């Protein structure tokens, strides 16, 4: 292998909002924050939980609120 062409590895800590922390090696940074992880994700826990931190559902409903009414006016 060639020397000095590979990125440096740092020990990184991944922190979730639920309090779970994990250590891994990364070339990007030393600390990573995430909103959801395997410790609190509904698929892995078996518990139903509504996850919409960015308000995406509200934005979708607002964007397409008049979609059905507009298509009836056009005659489609």
From Swiss-Prot:
Gene3D superfamilies: Ribosomal protein L31
Cofactors, names only: Zn(2+)
Pfam families from the UniProt entry: Ribosomal_L31
Binding positions (Zn(2+)): 16, 18, 37, 40
Source organism of the structure: Maridesulfovibrio salexigens (strain ATCC 14822 / DSM 2638 / NCIMB 8403 / VKM B-1763)
An annotated GO cellular component: ribonucleoprotein complex
Protein name: Large ribosomal subunit protein bL31
Annotated keywords: Metal-binding, Ribonucleoprotein, Ribosomal protein, RNA-binding, rRNA-binding, Zinc
A GO molecular-function descriptor: structural constituent of ribosome
HAMAP family: Ribosomal_bL31_1
Gene: rpmE
The keyword Ribosomal protein belongs to this UniProt entry's keyword annotation: yes
A biological process from GO: translation
Assembly and interaction partners: Part of the 50S ribosomal subunit.
Cofactor binding comment, as recorded: Binds 1 zinc ion per subunit.
Highest rank taxon of the organism: Bacteria
